[in-house]
C-alpha cells in the first residue's frame, strides 16, 4: 500500500513526523509531500496565480511552496507518477479540527483533495490543552492512530467521504475509547479582531480566538462532546454539501 502524507503546519512540523510514523505502521511505501511554510487556515485554496516550487529534502520527502491542496495534487499527479497513492493521510495537526474548524482547516483540505482525486483519505488532529503549555501529547495520536486506521481501511471508505479523526488532549492511557461523531457547533462569540498599531501609527489586525473558559455544553454525539469526554472522535465528512432537506423546501417555494 502506497501512502501519501501531507499537512498544513509545514514540512518541519512535529505532527508531520508523527503521521509518517503512523503511516509506517501500515506500510513501508510512504511518501511525504508537505508545504514548505506553515499553511494553517488556508482551507482548500489552490495556487493558480503563482508557480509551485518543488524541493526534495530527502528520500521520498518533498517540500512544496504552496498549499496542502497543491501538495496532494503534486504528490498524486507528479511525484508518484501514474500509480498514485492508495491512501492519503493529512496531519497530524497541532490542535483539533472540529465543528467550524473543518471549513478553515488546511489539514481537512488535504484529505478532501485526496478524496476528490479518488483516494481514501483521512485527516488527523491532536487536541492540546493550555494546561500543558499548548504542547500536544503527540504520543496519543501515535498510540491510537494506527489501529483506528486499520479498522476503517479494512471496512472501506465510501467515495467522496473523508474521515476526520481527532485525538483528545490526554495521555494515551487516559483515552476512554473511540466515538463516531457528527460535526459540532461552536460559540463563534469567541472570534475576535485584534487591532494594533505599527511603528508609524498605522493600524494592522490579527484574527484570533479568546482564550476563555468554554461555558457551553457541547451537544451529545458531536466531535466536541467526544473530545471533552476523553474519546477519540471519528467523523465521516461528505464532499457533497447539498442540503437535501432545504432543497425540498426550495422546490416548493420556487416551484
UniProtKB/Swiss-Prot annotation:
The keyword rRNA-binding does not apply. Its cofactor is a divalent metal cation. Binds 1 divalent metal cation per subunit. It is an enzyme of class 3 (hydrolase). Gene3D superfamilies: Survival protein SurE-like phosphatase/nucleotidase. Keywords: Cytoplasm, Hydrolase, Metal-binding, Nucleotide-binding. Its main location: cytoplasm. InterPro entries: SurE (IPR030048), SurE-like_Pase/nucleotidase (IPR002828), SurE-like_sf (IPR036523). A divalent metal cation binds at residues 8-9, 40, 93. Its EC number is 3.1.3.5. Pfam families: SurE (PF01975). GO terms for molecular function: 3'-nucleotidase activity; 5'-nucleotidase activity; exopolyphosphatase activity; metal ion binding; nucleotide binding. It is found in: Cytoplasm. Disulfide bonds: none annotated. One of its GO terms (cellular component) is cytoplasm. Belongs to the SurE nucleotidase family. NCBIfam families: PRK00346.1-4, surE. Nucleotidase that shows phosphatase activity on nucleoside 5'-monophosphates. This is 5'-nucleotidase SurE.
